[in-house]
């Protein structure tokens, strides 16, 4: 099988039942294709007792999960195109090609930061990219091809945000990429000159720009703001909406799937694009969590066949939303953190355990009015410095919440901590994002 069957598109106004039926048919298409074209998946499934005739009926939960470490270790056997070889892709990335460049003139290449221990490389073919382009219809924005769009994030490498903007929005509008690693005052001057009509970037960096706008240092008037890349708290939304009274869209995008979920302007929940992927939110035992519960996201990308991701364990923890009425798509209410943002703490018995990032957000008692952003700096398992951006005098509330976490963990007597307010939390020099947990150099 050299060519897959056609990807089934979701018609406008489709109901939930129809969306899920299309999802299942596209899953069958994907499984049939990888059985014939991906040596890794064919062997992987056969080793778990599956054969080709099972692919027409097997449920998603009957398939074994995969991970970044597994797929990167077997990359050359996972991909379905012989032009894709990990060593060649790594060498191409190191050449620092322009964002809109294509590998072998046909593949769009992204990579992760490697902060979790191994850099992930993800490849999309033109068909997958066209599918994303067709879905990237942002509301309240029809200013034409000469409209200025600015992406504000990490632009020094092939991270998903910059590449997606260059390859999708760059084909429609006058796009500029602005590095979040440059001084904010310099970026504000450039933005004042650019006067963008659409502003896109990490939630943390867009909030910083909103603060500059509220003080008068930034004078731009976008018609729409799109945030992505890191969690967007209620306080951050309030500040952005105070700076610009325009629609604010929260896009959940990752290297593994460029459009996982999106929130319409004014909506608290994000709609999962169930026709493009299967998003399972699972507990530690691998069971689907109930509505309003938090679990780890396991993703099956249905639209990208070049590097198939099937039951792929993401690093993200999300809170599952409810299905009120009969919406076509499922929802998530919060992106709580990432697996590699665990905070190590010393327990009373001398052992070292981790506090899950879920508990370092609003899920763990940090949903505090006026609190914009937190960062937990681990100096040692016995010492944590908590930095926060927000209004004055929140130290006691933050300390109370963290003390309760330590007590529940059995570390209240063995871990000391400080809480300090800062004007802004500095982004990571590699990713441009503000990490929830930062490991300070051990002294």
Annotate each PLM feature.
Residues 1-10, 69-224, 228-244, 257, ...:
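Active-site phosphate/ATP/adenylate-binding loop shared across adenylate-forming ligases
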Residues 175, 248, 279, 415-419:
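Generic structural signal for residues in well-ordered beta-strands
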Residues 183, 232, 281, 393-394:
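Glycine-/small-residue-rich active-site loops that bind phosphorylated ligands and cofactors
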Residues 147-149, 297, 384:
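Conserved hydrophobic helix-helix packing surfaces used for dimerization/oligomerization
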Residues 232-324:
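Conserved AMP-binding/adenylate-forming
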Residues 1-111, 117-131, 137-144, 219-220, ...:
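Nucleotide 5′-phosphate-binding alpha/beta core
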Residues 199, 303-413:
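AMP-binding/adenylate-forming catalytic core of the ANL superfamily
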